[in-house]
Amino acid sequence: MRKVLFITSLNIILFSCVSQKNVVSSASPTPTTQKIVEKPKIEHHGTEDFYRVNIADSAKNNNTISYGSIVSAKPKKYKITKTYFPSLGQGFRQRFIILHYTALDNEKSIRVLTQQSVSSHYLVSDLDDHEIYQLVDENKRAYHAGISSWKNSNNLNDSSIGIEIVNTGYVVDSLGKRLFQAFPEHQIEKIAVLVKDISKRYMIPPTNILAHSDIAPTRKQDPGPLFPWKTLYEKHQIGMWYDEDKKQEFYPSALEDTTTLYEDASFIRKIQLTFKSFGYDIQITGMWDKQTKSVIEAFQYHFRPENYDGILDAETWSILQALAQKYK
């Protein structure tokens, strides 16, 4: 019995030594040069497009494969049947459309949005042609919104279609004011047709067609005050806009409020609560603090682009009330 125990112990010691030796002697992998491989082509079958290869980083949970139509499981030994398809209890992931500008030219926009950690579902160039670039499957999550919020929805990458628009953004003048670049008419026409198509297919309401600055007002300015939201609303029935008669109806009381109550904490809280109820992510502080100024500025970019100084004047207040009443 002792001999058996001795031999067993010896074997364990030898195994342990060999294991330790293997750990110590393991060599670091030799660096290799990565080869540039041409991307696989999109496959076309009838009217359907398919992309069957993942060229993204799987370790980061990224995947470029597009299955198209209905995606079904394929369990071994069992058949998936669609006898009772579809269930009524389902909805679209796509609940918002978020519009951005790239702050880059065409070439750089394509490179950044396809080769780095940011992306969008679509890219609209500033070229006067008949092409719109698709970069991400609509059923996939693109990385365009970042930390974001609108009403009760957060992290809008999960629930939105992102559209990037080629536009160089803004420069800052000697007084510190941002001067934005205009959008050519042919580019706006592309955007309008694209947004109309997406919003119709996914039944996205006007209240959920937003600027990046709307959902991230303390971080972002795009697509800026020169983006023609009013034109999109009046010409294409896209997005939100106020009714002029309602604005005029609210203006006298708004003028009195901003004249007599401007520094009153309860009035400031009322303003903040109205912005929050409308959709903006804002803390109720009762102060004209930095975050409140950023929210006002983002609102002005969208709905009062003639003056976007971040100060609540009578016109801004009357427009906010008209919108809050219209889209409550």
Language-model features, listed with the residues they occupy:
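Sec-dependent signal peptide recognition
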Residues: R2-T8
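C-terminal motif of bacterial Sec signal peptides marking the signal peptidase cleavage site
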Residues: I13-S16
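Bacterial signal peptide processing site
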Residues: V18-K21
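Active-site-adjacent loop/helix surface patches within enzyme catalytic domains
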Residues: V24, S28-P205
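Second-shell loop/turn segments in exported
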Residues: F85-P86, I110, S149-N152, L175-H186, ...
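Acidic, His- and aromatic-enriched active-site or binding-groove loops in soluble protein domains
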Residues: L123-V124, P225-P252
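Acidic/histidine-rich, metal-coordinating catalytic segments
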Residues: I204-R219
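Short acidic, glycine/serine/threonine-rich helix-capping segments at coil-helix boundaries
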Residues: T259-R269, K276-L323
